[in-house]
Amino acid sequence: MSAKASKAPASKAPAEKKPAAKKTSSSTDPSKKRTKARKETYSSYIYKVLKQTHPDTGISQKSMSILNSFVNDIFERIATESSKLAAYNKKSTISAREIQTAVRLILPGELAKHAVSEGTRAVTKYSSSTQA
């Protein structure tokens, strides 16, 4: 028993200091080029619609940016509303029905009617093209 009493508590040795790793800048190394982050926009689609309706009309970059923000905003509103509708009905999938109801709730009057009819037409066209 005297052996246990004479045993001293283990002392902790200080951690060894490691030399600091050299920081290599990726901007100085030409072999590692940094790819630019791509930004998803609706610009090409907006431009195509513009040329279908007004072939001789152009659009400025600022106007394109505003329209792109508008499309993103409407998309987000419809997605959020349709997500809520799916949750209310205890469904985990957003279907065309939820999208259509969300459009009716978000867009006012005549605009909602036109949007629903165009959306239905687009879905029908897509369905017929995938079956063929």
From Swiss-Prot:
- Listed GO cellular component terms? CENP-A containing nucleosome; nucleus
- Disulfide-bond pairs as recorded: none
**Residues that bear Phosphoserine:** 11
Q: How is it modified after translation?
A: Monoubiquitinated by the UBC2-BRE1 complex to form H2BK123ub1. H2BK123ub1 gives a specific tag for epigenetic transcriptional activation and is also prerequisite for H3K4me and H3K79me formation. H2BK123ub1 also modulates the formation of double-strand breaks during meiosis and is a prerequisite for DNA-damage checkpoint activation.
Residues bearing N6-acetyllysine are 7, 12, 17
Keywords linked to the UniProt accession: Acetylation, Chromosome, DNA-binding, Isopeptide bond, Methylation, Nucleosome core, Nucleus, Phosphoprotein, Ubl conjugation
Where on this protein does the Glycyl lysine isopeptide (Lys-Gly) (interchain with G-Cter in ubiquitin) crosslink form?
125
- Tagged with keyword Calcium: no
Where are the residues linked by the Glycyl lysine isopeptide (Lys-Gly) (interchain with G-Cter in SUMO) cross-link? 7, 17-18
Localization (cell): Nucleus; Chromosome
Q: Does the keyword Nucleus apply?
A: yes
- Bias regions of kind Low complexity — which residues? 1-13
Q: Which residues lie within the region annotated Disordered?
A: 1-39
State the superkingdom: Eukaryota
One of the entry's Gene Ontology molecular-function terms is: structural constituent of chromatin
Q: Name the InterPro entries on file.
A: Histone-fold, Histone_H2A/H2B/H3, Histone_H2B, HISTONE_H2B_site
The record describes its quaternary structure and partners as:
The nucleosome is a histone octamer containing two molecules each of H2A, H2B, H3 and H4 assembled in one H3-H4 heterotetramer and two H2A-H2B heterodimers. The octamer wraps approximately 147 bp of DNA.
Q: What role does this protein play?
A: Core component of nucleosome. Nucleosomes wrap and compact DNA into chromatin, limiting DNA accessibility to the cellular machineries which require DNA as a template. Histones thereby play a central role in transcription regulation, DNA repair, DNA replication and chromosomal stability. DNA accessibility is regulated via a complex set of post-translational modifications of histones, also called histone code, and nucleosome remodeling.
Which family is it part of?
Belongs to the histone H2B family.
Q: What is this protein called?
A: Histone H2B.1
Native organism is: Kluyveromyces lactis (strain ATCC 8585 / CBS 2359 / DSM 70799 / NBRC 1267 / NRRL Y-1140 / WM37)
Q: What is the lineage of its organism?
A: Eukaryota, Fungi, Dikarya, Ascomycota, Saccharomycotina
